[in-house]
Swiss-Prot record:
Full protein name: 3-hydroxyacyl-[acyl-carrier-protein] dehydratase FabZ
Active-site residues, as the UniProt record annotates them: 46
SUPFAM superfamilies (UniProt xref): Thioesterase/thiol ester dehydrase-isomerase
The protein's Enzyme Commission number: 4.2.1.59
Recorded family membership: Belongs to the thioester dehydratase family. FabZ subfamily.
Compartment annotation: Cytoplasm
UniProt entry keywords in alphabetical sequence: Cytoplasm, Lipid A biosynthesis, Lipid biosynthesis, Lipid metabolism, Lyase
GO biological process: fatty acid biosynthetic process; lipid A biosynthetic process
GO MF, one annotated term: (3R)-hydroxyacyl-[acyl-carrier-protein] dehydratase activity
Gene Ontology cellular component list: cytoplasm; membrane
Gene: fabZ
Catalytic activity: a (3R)-hydroxyacyl-[ACP] = a (2E)-enoyl-[ACP] + H2O
Biological role: Involved in unsaturated fatty acids biosynthesis. Catalyzes the dehydration of short chain beta-hydroxyacyl-ACPs and long chain saturated and unsaturated beta-hydroxyacyl-ACPs.
One Pfam family recorded for the sequence: FabA
């Protein structure tokens, strides 16, 4: 999926759209990327002399990745996905300008409109962040 297809699925726009491309998507798994550049607005304050992507934004990027997975299903087109929670979140590596964040999300449980995914973000094959994300699909 290119950026136009991602924008058709997600309501997010600059500066909050944190998925640049989807490399693969199946019924229960997705791989996407975020190219992190020094031009990201959050680097102005986090931190000016030592820019590091905020962990909460890495988790948001993972949530958006999972959202694309859910909203790529025909029955969910035009709906919204709402973050409902995160658990077992771990940050293992700093993400800095020039990094390419490779994000994966895999469904592990679904009940009605609630879904749970295992999500991972890696840079150069090394784990940067992971967690279990819960979200709801609604109108």
């Amino acid at each position: 999926m290119d950026i136009r297809e991602i924008q058709a699925a997600l309501p997010h726009r600059y500066p909050m759209l944190l998925v640049d491309r989807v490399l693969e998507v199946s019924d229960d798994h997705i791989v996407a990327i975020k190219n992190v550049t020094i031009n990201e607005p959050f680097f102005n304050g986090h931190f000016p002399h030592y820019p590091v992507m905020p962990g909460v934004l890495i988790m948001e990027a993972l949530a958006q990745t999972a959202g694309v997975l859910e909203l790529s299903k025909e029955e969910n087109k035009g709906k919204l996905v709402f973050y409902a929670g995160m658990d077992k979140v771990k940050f293992k590596k700093q993400v800095v300008p020039g990094d390419q964040l490779v994000m994966t999300a895999t469904f592990i449980k679904r009940r009605g409109t609630i879904a749970v995914v295992e999500a991972r973000a890696e840079v150069d094959g090394k784990l940067a962040a992971s967690g279990t994300l819960t979200f709801a699909c609604g109108q």
